[in-house]
Amino acid sequence: MKTLLLTLVVVTIVCLDLGYTLKCNKLVPLFYKTCPAGKNLCYKMYMVATPKVPVKRGCIDVCPKSSLLVKYVCCNTDRCN
């Protein structure tokens, strides 16, 4: 009985997400990083002249404003950038 109870406790701990962590793509989308606490957005930065070629990707706390030369796209789900 104790073994069954211990097994149920372990399974519960493994299955519960004890603290949600966002995952954002790095520059090469095959790789991603787990964002630290407080950084709850993924972002993609690219030059307006070349929108198909991202310059930077990662985690961020506040989405920066785009400019005439640089555009930022932010999102808040895993690997959305």
UniProtKB/Swiss-Prot annotation:
Presence of the UniProt keyword Signal in the record: yes
Where on the tree of life does the source sit, at the highest rank? Eukaryota
Extent of the signal sequence:
1-21
What the entry lists under InterPro entries is as follows: Cytotoxin_Cobra, Snake_3FTx, Snake_toxin-like_sf, Snake_toxin_con_site, Toxin_cobra-type
Task: State what protein this is by name.
Answer: Cytotoxin 1
Q: What is its main location?
A: secreted
Subcellular localization, as worded in the UniProt entry: Secreted; Target cell membrane
Q: Does the record carry Phosphoprotein as a key word? A: no
Q: In which tissues is it expressed?
A: Expressed by the venom gland.
Q: Which family does it belong to?
A: Belongs to the three-finger toxin family. Short-chain subfamily. Type IA cytotoxin sub-subfamily.
Q: Could you cite one Gene Ontology molecular function of this protein?
A: toxin activity
Q: Which UniProt keywords apply?
A: Cytolysis, Disulfide bond, Membrane, Pharmaceutical, Secreted, Signal, Target cell membrane, Target membrane, Toxin
This protein's GO cellular component annotations are: extracellular region; membrane; other organism cell membrane
Q: What is the lineage of its organism?
A: Eukaryota, Metazoa, Chordata, Craniata, Vertebrata
Q: Report the record's Gene Ontology biological process terms.
A: killing of cells of another organism
The disulfide bonds in this chain are 24-42, 35-59, 63-74, 75-80
Q: Can you state the subunit structure given in the record? A: Monomer in solution; homodimer and oligomer in the presence of negatively charged lipids forming a pore with a size ranging between 20 and 30 Angstroms.
Cited function: Shows cytolytic activity on many different cells by forming pores in lipid membranes. Exhibits concentration-dependent growth inhibitory effects in the lung cell lines A549 (IC(50)= 0.88) and NL20 (IC(50)= 1.91), in the prostate cell lines PC-3 (IC(50)= 3.13 ug/ml) and RWPE-1 (IC(50)=0.35 ug/ml), and in the breast cell lines MCF-7 (IC(50)= 9.10 ug/ml) and 184B5 (IC(50)=6.21 ug/ml), with high selectivity for the lung cancer cell line A549 (selectivity index=2.17).
